[in-house]
Regions:
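Substrate-binding pocket helix/loop in short-chain dehydrogenase/reductase
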Residues: 100-101, 105-110
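The beta1-alpha1 cofactor-binding region of Rossmann-like NAD(H)/NADP(H)-dependent oxidoreductases
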Residues: 63-74, 106
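Active-site helix of classical SDR
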Residues: 124, 162-165
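Conserved glycine-rich cofactor-binding loop
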Residues: 17-18
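A short, exposed helix-loop element centered on a Lys and neighboring polar residues
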Residues: 124-125, 171
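Conserved glycine-rich Rossmann-like NAD(P)H-binding loop of the short-chain dehydrogenase/reductase
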Residues: 33-48
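SDR active-site lid
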Residues: 179-245
Length: 277
């Protein structure tokens, strides 16, 4: 299948001020795309926009919060006003939480779902309407999920639950809009060298992430590597992007052998408890 041209295509990205979102924005600029960037940190968002322009693309920064429907509507309205329409959407906004289940409050559970899952739903709803209005465009919706959408690692149960929820919605949506020629892709990064683990530790009230220190190099990657895989998926759409092939096989095996997985996760939990004391 021939690769689709991304030149002048309009990509709306949430969570674009850092990490994977910022890396995808820059890669999109290098591919000649026009990137509409959303995030809560306006100064960082503007800095990313400058890097997109330096890479060869166009950029528009639209600060906002994906948990607020009015902000999401404003984001897509700004994209349409600036560039005439939207070709593709990457719902990337989200954060991590690294806490035992019995130490996680219901407020924390609801808050992470509000951003990671319901923020994604708001983005996808607006994004679906936008790409439907462009019959000649890329018509592509993408979601930054995670490898842990496949299982619940110790101390990451709340976070993993949001990613599993994203996956379920994306899978259903993929089937529902396939006949319209609209593509839906989920991205499943492993431990990515971004602010993620630092933020997860901060949200958990600790000064370091036990998950980060226990993640083998084989299951870590750079945001730039993930971004290159996202751009490749925009050119040649696929249902899922797993930037780490070893992780894909490992998580498939984990699903196939639940008893072995339970044993391995229990060992990991015991090791983290020992290190956390």
């Amino acid at each position: 299948v021939a690769a689709r041209s991304l030149s002048n295509a309009v990509l709306v990205l949430t969570g674009a001020s850092s990490g994977i979102g910022a890396a995808v924005a820059e890669a999109a600029g290098a591919a000649g795309m026009r990137a509409v960037l959303n995030g809560r940190r306006a100064e960082k968002l503007q800095a990313v926009a400058e890097r997109v322009r330096a890479a060869g693309g166009e950029a528009l920064a639209v600060p906002g919060d994906v948990t607020r429907e009015a902000d999401v509507e404003e984001l897509f309205a700004a994209a349409a006003e600036a560039f005439g329409g939207v070709d593709a959407v990457l719902a990337n906004a989200g954060y991590g939480l690294e806490k035992r289940f019995d130490a996680t409050s219901m407020r924390e559970h609801r808050a992470i779902f509000e951003t990671n899952h319901f923020g994604t739903l708001l983005t996808l709803r607006a994004g679906l309407a936008a790409v439907r209005a462009e019959p000649g465009g890329l018509r592509h919706l993408l979601v930054t999920s995670s490898c842990v959408s496949e299982l619940g690692p110790p101390r990451f149960g709340a976070y993993a639950a949001t990613k599993a929820a994203q996956d379920a919605v994306a899978q259903a949506l993929r089937a529902e809009v396939a006949a319209e020629g609209i593509r839906v892709t989920t991205i499943h990064p492993v431990g990515t060298r971004t602010e993620f683990f630092d933020t997860a530790a901060a949200n958990s009230g600790t000064d370091r992430s036990l998950a980060d220190t226990n993640t083998p190099d084989l299951f870590t990657q750079t945001a730039g590597h993930v971004a290159r895989r996202v751009i490749a998926a925009l050119k040649r759409p696929v249902a899922e992007v797993w930037p780490s092939r070893p992780a894909r096989f490992a998580f498939a095996a984990a699903t196939a052998f639940p008893g072995l997985t339970a044993w391995g996760l229990a060992r990991a939990a015991a090791r983290m408890e020992k290190q956390g004391r």
